[in-house]
């Protein structure tokens, strides 16, 4: 038999073929491995016979194996069968150093720490904030959570599952098992169904398989060329599963869409404290009840940082309590989170009323922040959001007429939108004439609508106003409102004041429909820059009046400002170290400010301090005269009176003045310490 076998294999090279039975058998076995039909040349039969096993192996190697490791698509072109599309780490293979960093990612990190794997960069992505982590380490995960969002550690497993489903919905992966079954179904399964129909129409019943390696040479050959020997069985299984799932595709798709919307809403509620309004496709803040212009994360971040930054530090139980309170009674929660009812006395009403009338007279513009149906039906809008929104719209209109196209609240446009909380929190009022801010404590005009400008102004002019309580701030706001109303009543006969650049601004404001009302806050700001406030002002007013006197401004009642009318002091004076001097140091530490040296002088020993810092004051007291810490209030008052009397005798006014006084006794250096030693 061996020679015969050798003769068959050698004779198949091209001289003569084998018998007809062998040729017919080989003709049946060639199509699965070959690339041609059933008709093959006789001289190539031997070569095809030698390539049969290799071709079959090649087709088996290219066919998708029903293995647990081959979870990704079979045609991805990767070298290894376990692709990075799977979520967990590789189940049973050793590590490949330098190639697959996925070996460090664990599936339980997804629900325990809300960390997903990004196969594109072989790293982790936080599903809470979207940040990319540097390494695949548990320590990196814990450090990221502690630094970015420690409150997520207190979330329940159900809340974490909501975040995970929302993340999958965001990536388009499907939020649950049904989502994966329905989301993956799509064009691929439709194509498979079409292929199945074509195969059924091509004669699948007419050509049933007769054996493990035998197949008819008709349509079945085309079918086997497509997927290999085991492809039809796997395709039938997949298509039967797709048919069962496709039977309820319409109902499942609707259910999936509803679940995704619910999970997205729950994610906004748990993470951002934002409730989603499906009717208007908007977000409503659960801390203040205001509607946001869009679903963009930049708008959410800007709103939280500008309106209530304290909500970022809420713990998990506090957030849960806020969610429960919002779900139970949103109106009561909005009343609790809103400003005190003293807003009616705030000077914002002076411009708000005029802008209310102006907006009522004109055509109603598109209010992106609060649609009327959401206001009336959901009850999510606070008591008085109208004036603030109309101010923003009017200011946007002013920017457009001035040549600035209307932009979204993100970017530089946020400088045109003052915040209502500035009235009582920082005692800052909007000046409609020049589109700036006016300080309700000292009457100074601020250059821009920025928090940094407000904080710098308060730190330089009256740092003690930050420690005022709510009743004192309400009293100052009430007095400011009364004085502003009085100035508005006296406003019409005063437009002839020497104000060069004001008429164009007021003319542009009059185009908006509120020109007269917006012209008067400008006069109010310029007059209040020189007029001291009523006795309800804080203790920092004497220092401010002293600065005004040093600058040479006359504190007249209604005197007109000089031709250069900026109320703040000149830049050299505003940038000196005096801005860091706290008036309370005078009574608390017995420290006075020396304007000639721009430093501190101790009233007890007369020593000069190097820097304007509390640490320097305390170190000086501990090193030189620690007994002064035990002084009673009466003793401190006695030292203050003696110091002021000596200063009056030496310099002609209380304390050290701005100019350095010339020595009177032939070069004797005058110090305030002589007062206490005397």
UniProtKB/Swiss-Prot annotation:
Biased composition (Pro residues): 492-504, 560-572
Bias-annotated ranges (Basic and acidic residues): 79-88, 573-583
Annotated site location: Breakpoint for translocation to form ZFTA-MLK2 fusion protein: 138
Annotated GO biological process: negative regulation of DNA-templated transcription
InterPro entries associated with the record: SPIN-DOC_Znf-C2H2 (IPR040647), Znf_C2H2_type (IPR013087), ZnF_transloc-Spindlin_int (IPR052675)
Biased composition regions of type Low complexity, renumbered to the chain: 62-78
Cross-link (Glycyl lysine isopeptide (Lys-Gly) (interchain with G-Cter in SUMO2)): 375
TM region positions: none
Pfam families registered for this protein in UniProt: zf-C2H2_12
Keyword annotations of the record: Chromosomal rearrangement, Isopeptide bond, Ubl conjugation
Domain of life: Eukaryota
Gene Ontology CC terms, in alphabetical order: nucleus
Region Disordered, annotated ranges: 1-100, 182-250, 329-417, 490-583
Biased composition (Acidic residues): 187-201, 388-398, 513-529, 543-553
Disease linked to the protein: A chromosomal aberration involving MRTFB is found in 3 chondroid lipomas. Translocation t(11;16)(q13;p13) with MRTFB produces a ZFTA-MRTFB fusion protein. A chromosomal aberration involving RELA is found in more than two-thirds of supratentorial ependymomas. Translocation with RELA produces a ZFTA-RELA fusion protein. ZFTA-RELA translocations are potent oncogenes that probably transform neural stem cells by driving an aberrant NF-kappa-B transcription program.
Protein's UniProt name: Zinc finger translocation-associated protein
Organism name: Homo sapiens (Human)
Lineage: Eukaryota, Metazoa, Chordata, Craniata, Vertebrata
Gene name for this UniProt entry: ZFTA
């Amino acid at each position: 038999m061996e020679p015969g076998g050798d003769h068959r294999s050698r004779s198949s090279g091209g001289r003569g073929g084998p018998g007809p039975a062998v040729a017919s058998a080989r003709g049946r076995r060639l199509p699965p491995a070959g690339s041609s039909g059933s008709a093959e040349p006789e001289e190539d039969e031997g070569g095809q016979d030698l390539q049969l096993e290799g071709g079959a192996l090649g087709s088996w190697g290219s066919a998708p194996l029903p293995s647990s490791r081959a979870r990704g698509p079979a045609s991805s072109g990767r070298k290894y069968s376990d692709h990075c599309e799977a979520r967990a780490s590789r189940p049973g293979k050793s590590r490949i150093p330098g190639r697959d960093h996925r070996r460090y990612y664990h599936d339980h990190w997804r629900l325990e720490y809300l960390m997903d794997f990004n196969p594109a960069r072989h790293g982790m992505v936080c599903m809470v904030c979207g940040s990319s982590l540097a390494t695949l380490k548990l320590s990196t995960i814990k450090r990221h959570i502690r630094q970015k969002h420690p409150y997520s550690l207190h979330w329940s497993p159900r809340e974490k599952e909501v975040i995970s489903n929302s993340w999958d919905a965001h990536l388009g992966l499907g939020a649950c098992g049904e989502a994966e079954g329905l989301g993956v179904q799509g064009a691929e399964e439709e194509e498979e169904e079409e292929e199945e129909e074509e195969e059924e129409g091509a004669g699948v019943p007419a050509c049933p398989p007769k054996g493990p390696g035998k197949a008819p040479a008709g349509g079945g050959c085309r079918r086997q060329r497509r997927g290999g020997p085991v492809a039809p069985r796997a395709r039938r299984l997949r298509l039967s599963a797709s048919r069962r799932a496709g039977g309820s595709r319409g109902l499942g798709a609707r259910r999936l869409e509803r679940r995704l919307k619910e999970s997205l809403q729950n994610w906004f509620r748990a993470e951002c404290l934002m409730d989603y309004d499906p009717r208007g496709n908007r977000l409503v803040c659960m801390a203040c009840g205001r509607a946001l212009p869009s679903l963009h994360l930049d708008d959410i971040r800007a709103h939280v940082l500008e309106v209530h930054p304290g909500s970022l530090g809420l713990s998990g139980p506090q957030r849960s309590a806020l969610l429960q309170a919002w779900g139970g009674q949103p109106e009561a929660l909005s009343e609790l989170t809103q400003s005190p009812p003293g807003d009616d006395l705030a000077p914002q009403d002076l411009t708000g009323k005029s802008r209310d009338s102006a907006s009522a007279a004109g055509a109603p513009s598109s209010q992106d922040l609060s649609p009327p149906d959401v206001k009336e039906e959901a009850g999510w809008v606070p008591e008085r959001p109208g004036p603030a929104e109309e101010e923003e719209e009017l200011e946007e209109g002013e920017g457009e007429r001035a040549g600035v196209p209307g932009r979204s609240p993100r970017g530089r446009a946020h400088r045109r939108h003052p915040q209502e909380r500035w009235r009582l929190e920082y005692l800052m009022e909007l000046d409609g004439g020049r589109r700036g801010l006016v300080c309700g404590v000292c009457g100074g005009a601020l250059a821009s609508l920025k928090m940094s400008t407000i904080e710098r102004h308060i730190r330089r002019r009256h740092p003690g106003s930050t420690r005022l309580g709510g009743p004192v701030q309400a009293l100052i706001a009430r007095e400011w409102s009364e004085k502003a109303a009085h100035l508005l009543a006296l406003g019409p006969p005063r437009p002839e004041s020497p104000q060069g650049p004001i008429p164009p601004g007021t003319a542009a404001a009059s185009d908006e429909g509120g020109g007269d009302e917006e012209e008067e806050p400008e006069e109010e700001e310029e007059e209040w820059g020189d007029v001291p406030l009523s006795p309800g002002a804080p203790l920092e007013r004497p220092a401010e009046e002293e600065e005004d006197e040093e600058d040479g401004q006359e504190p007249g009642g209604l005197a007109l400002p000089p031709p250069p009318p900026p109320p703040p002091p000149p830049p050299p004076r505003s940038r000196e170290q005096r801005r860091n001097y706290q008036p309370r140091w005078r009574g608390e530490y017995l420290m006075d400010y020396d304007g000639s040296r721009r430093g501190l002088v101790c009233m007890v020993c007369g020593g000069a301090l190097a820097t304007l810092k509390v640490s320097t004051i305390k170190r000086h007291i501990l090193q030189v005269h620690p007994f002064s810490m035990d002084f009673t209030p009466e003793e401190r008052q006695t030292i203050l009176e003696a110091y002021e009397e000596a200063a009056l005798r030496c310099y002609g006014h209380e304390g050290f003045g701005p100019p350095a006084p010339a020595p009177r006794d032939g070069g004797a250096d005058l110090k305030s310490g002589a007062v206490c030693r005397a």
